[in-house]
């Protein structure tokens, strides 16, 4: 029974505030506040309707997007993968071109997995890219994009037409 104190120490460490603080940020909900720096950015939490960070008399908050086919040049990912469809399908949510992903927290790492449509073949192989913690990531969203999974607590902005 000499292992019991070590097990108890590990359990306490796993539940400590620093371990909890390292968890993915909370996924936004309609009506919750968002930072003004995210104004006009959108997010699309898995299994929900897309949200936009909109400003008003009470400040900035996440609002449900009315359009069934939202498209934006600014997206926010919050840790868990956010999957969007590109120009390889009808009603793309993200356009191809040069993008920059900026971590919203110094420990966050932005990453993306892209799958393009290959004419006559179907979906091509995944193309992965990942930035360093706290550092912006520059990437090209490929033409004929089928899907992209964005990860990290990051603001993604299109920088070219």
Model regions: which residues?
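A short tyrosine-centered beta-strand micro-motif
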Residues: 97-101
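Primarily secretory-pathway and cell-envelope proteins
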Residues: 22-74, 106-161
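Surface-exposed ligand/attachment interfaces on beta-rich extracellular proteins
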Residues: 76-94
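Secretory targeting and sorting signals
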Residues: 1-24
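Generic detector of short, well-ordered, non-transmembrane alpha-helical segments enriched
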Residues: 17-19, 49, 95
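Generic detector of ordered secondary-structure context
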Residues: 13-15, 45, 91
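A generic structural signal for solvent-exposed, polar alpha-helical segments
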Residues: 9-13, 68, 81, 105
């Amino acid at each position: 029974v000499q292992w019991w104190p070590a097990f108890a120490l590990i359990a306490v460490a796993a539940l400590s505030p620093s371990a909890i603080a390292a968890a993915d940020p909370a996924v936004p909900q309609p009506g919750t506040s968002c930072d003004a720096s995210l104004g006009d950015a959108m997010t699309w939490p898995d299994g929900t309707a897309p949200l936009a960070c909109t400003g008003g008399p009470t400040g900035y908050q996440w609002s449900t997007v009315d359009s069934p086919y939202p498209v934006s040049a600014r997206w926010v990912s919050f840790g868990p993968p956010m999957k969007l469809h590109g120009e390889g399908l009808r009603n793309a949510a993200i356009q191809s071109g040069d993008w920059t992903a900026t971590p919203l927290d110094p420990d966050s790492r932005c990453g993306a997995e892209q799958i393009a449509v290959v004419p006559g073949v179907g979906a091509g192989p995944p193309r992965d890219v990942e930035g360093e913690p706290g550092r912006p990531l520059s990437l090209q969203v490929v033409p004929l994009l089928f899907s992209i999974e964005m990860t990290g607590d990051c603001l993604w902005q299109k920088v070219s037409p």
